[in-house]
Amino acid sequence: MPKIVVLVKFTPDLTGDRSFLADGTVDRLSVAGRLSELDEHAAEQALQVQESCAGSELVYLTMGPDGATDALRKALSLGGDAAVHVRDDALHGSDAFATSLVLAAAIGRLGFDLVLTGMASTDAGMGVVPALLAERLAVPQVTFAGRLTVSGGTVEILRDSDTVSETVAGGRRAGSSGLLTHRGRLR
């Protein structure tokens, strides 16, 4: 049974007013938030993969304050089987390195065959967490995935960037639990 993990992030609504805490971080409890739009693309792709792989399990994973549960609820409303929220006050204001460490540990505990993420979060837009996760999980990363299909243990991804379209295929290898890819791009 393939296990698909989709990372989702609760981000502040960019159209609303924001306030900041004394440490310079956004006060996420005082602003309206939402599921990052780019993570919705990953969720939609995961649902398509789940439909094509009988018996697969789709789990959403997030890290953040209490409000991050709203992102999980939104993702689950699209479909999927379960959601996991890593929440600890000690993680407040974590940078990309700490975030990738915590998420990699959570993914390791969950187990996975495929991890999907948005290409970046809509709040910071750095896009570095997926690459850090791939390194920590010792799996390849494929960026700008436009279409993803799974058949017989092989994952085929159409990469579509501004300059080139190409197909990348891979399967499970010794020492590798899966493939990390991220979906969507800024337009």
Locations of regions flagged by a protein language model:
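N-terminal glycine-rich FAD/FM-binding segment characteristic of electron-transfer flavoproteins
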Residues: 1-187
